[in-house]
Amino acid sequence: MWHPALGPGWKPLLALALALTSLRGVRGIEEEPNSGGSFQIVTFKWHHVQDPYIIALWILVASLAKIVFHLSHKVTSVVPESALLIVLGLVLGGIVWAADHIASFTLTPTLFFFYLLPPIVLDAGYFMPNRLFFGNLGTILLYAVIGTIWNAATTGLSLYGVFLSGLMGELKIGLLDFLLFGSLIAAVDPVAVLAVFEEVHVNEVLFIIVFGESLLNDAVTVVLYNVFESFVTLGGDAVTGVDCVKGIVSFFVVSLGGTLVGVIFAFLLSLVTRFTKHVRIIEPGFVFVISYLSYLTSEMLSLSAILAITFCGICCQKYVKANISEQSATTVRYTMKMLASGAETIIFMFLGISAVDPVIWTWNTAFVLLTLVFISVYRAIGVVLQTWILNRYRMVQLETIDQVVMSYGGLRGAVAYALVVLLDEKKVKEKNLFVSTTLIVVFFTVIFQGLTIKPLVQWLKVKRSEQREPKLNEKLHGRAFDHILSAIEDISGQIGHNYLRDKWSNFDRKFLSKVLMRRSAQKSRDRILNVFHELNLKDAISYVAEGERRGSLAFIRSPSTDNMVNVDFSTPRPSTVEASVSYFLRENVSAVCLDMQSLEQRRRSIRDTEDMVTHHTLQQYLYKPRQEYKHLYSRHELTPNEDEKQDKEIFHRTMRKRLESFKSAKLGINQNKKAAKLYKRERAQKRRNSSIPNGKLPMENLAHNFTIKEKDLELSEPEEATNYEEISGGIEFLASVTKDVASDSGAGIDNPVFSPDEDLDPSILSRVPPWLSPGETVVPSQRARVQIPNSPSNFRRLTPFRLSNKSVDSFLQADGPEEQLQPASPESTHM
């Protein structure tokens, strides 16, 4: 089973274990700072750092263990990580005990309940799928309340009946002791369920029922444990009917009180994060501190702390995620996952370490084996009976296969162990027997059932969860079905899940969101804007994917066989050449002109023309770079994300251009009066420069002829103001490409960025690019005067990005026939 790659990985773990065993003897060799009567430069103060040092070492050991386990996928795919950690704990505990013969490190109830359990439960509540959880809340509550009471009562009474028969021998246990043991061993552990079921990947409904039961049965477990412990303290003869009634009332107080505390702190957390706009750096701290305070407050009031922190995470997640920044949300997500994973690792490892203590072990074969049998049998019976009742009212039935997995998934863990360790040995005489049996039950359920549940799920062909993001179409149809079902329930007068969900959504939108969410977050949550944003993302992805499918600028620049294979030549395009013009003219000798000087001039002419067209396209349509502002280090704020603001500006600018094109296509009007004036001015400039001696332009007029400021091309809506400064000193070369705009007769929306090649004014080819000196200009050859250079057969010009003049709404028309290019006149192509 063990992979050879794991061999070297165990060496650091064993070395750390030996170091931990030797740390206890370090205190004896410490020297006092002034033992020699003189000043000492360096002193050894182990006692000063003993506790935090040992804690850090154990965390390091647990983290290294996870790395070692995942070096081989074959091991972790068969054996659950929780089982591996328990085995590792047994090994390390054996090493520690062999060195000192004392159980130096054990899992104490204080460590578990106050430091290890809260991060795990908070993570489960904060990332809980709320709709799935509340949609199955009735089923979860039935299993959590009735099921836990059923398991506790039947297990305790059955063990007591066997004890009366004499099979267990002489034990100092009464009926209340058996019921107390049944109450702590009956609860399904959320830590164990999470550790095993996350690796199995069962379907969402089955997972949320088992996991929700493990979370919500805490209230029942705490109440039963406290009630029976009080009864044991009072004695069986002193218990009255009033005490039983108080126990029943205590259940409602503990469960509802813990839930109420969690909701109150969730409200407080959401309200605080609404006003943290200027202190983004401490937003994650509020999430963890206030959530932890809900746990401690419930524990202080003797309420259900697990329910408190669970509902705190469930109720605050929507508003907190909307209020805090993206960086803070990422910090909260990763920190919470890290704390939960680390706490879970330490819990299972310390369960193994705690078992290596001969003092706690008291063996009774009949008691241990019958406990394993009873918890398994009564768990299955309870699930079957409750499911039979639930299926009469559930729309989605729980099949027999689901019931088998639910019965087999009743795992026990560290909660049961921590509760049994809390027992007072003076009141419960057989405490060690209870502790030993609890450890056996935990190891059996986590290791044996954890090992076999995955093959069982595969053998039964249980429906697995789909790890994918639903498509936009699925979301829209799902939302439409929700409204339809809610309307049907409203018309029929039936109050169901859809009706309640719709009423809650309206209440949240009208009242809660306005109080707990900042205004900017309320606007960003608008569904229409979200759908519009997703449609535009899909639009952009489609354009990029189509561009990659048809080819790229790299093909034009580097016409090699390696790049040519990436271009799709399956769709024929009207063209006068079959290969790259650049490649043909640069690599092949003309059959007409054999003068090498003329050939070189022709090459330079075509190359310059390509560069001009490319530069023109990039300068006009691409986003202008912004000057980067260097922020100094600050402890109180993060460096702002420049890319996020730039992406938003690009998005807004592109959408304004597309909306303007949409107006012109629908109304049949020009896009912009300024664009028309600009075109007329370019026509006049073209007539003035129609006759150029030697193909050169006067250099003093270059700046005026080729520089058109960005404000001349503004659309009807002003662009969003920005704090950035444009980089100065760059090449300002932007020629007008606008003609008299007429409405396109074809269907679809004109996109300026993907406009047809006819929009390119041939006058730009008659001008000297600003990066060329007067001495570098050449007279184009005869062939270059007659024909404008073309790209490969499936491209129109050197602007391969503009594959279609339509948006993605009419993208299917991009492969249709296109008009033949009109060759430019020789007069318009003078350089």
From Swiss-Prot:
One of its GO terms (cellular component) is plasma membrane. Residues 588-665 are annotated as: Interaction with NHERF4. Residues 29-48, 100-108, 166-178, 235-241, 302-303, 357-364, 424-430 are extracellular. Most abundant in colon and small intestine, followed by kidney and stomach. In kidney, expressed in proximal tubules and outer medulla (at protein level). Residues 72-79, 127-129, 201-202, 277-278, 321-327, 387-399, 465-831 are cytoplasmic. Residues 573-587 are annotated as: Interaction with EZR. Residues 822-831 have a biased composition (Polar residues). Its main location: membrane. Phosphorylated by PRKACA at Ser-552 and Ser-605, which inhibits activity. Phosphorylation of Ser-605 is essential for cAMP-mediated inhibition of SLC9A3. Phosphorylation at Ser-661 by SGK1 is associated with increased abundance at the cell membrane. Phosphorylation at Ser-716 by CSNK2A1 regulates SLC9A3 activity through the formation of multiple signaling complexes. InterPro entries: Cation/H_exchanger_CPA1, Cation/H_exchanger_TM, Na/H_exchanger_3/5, NaH_exchanger. This is Sodium/hydrogen exchanger 3. The gene is Slc9a3.
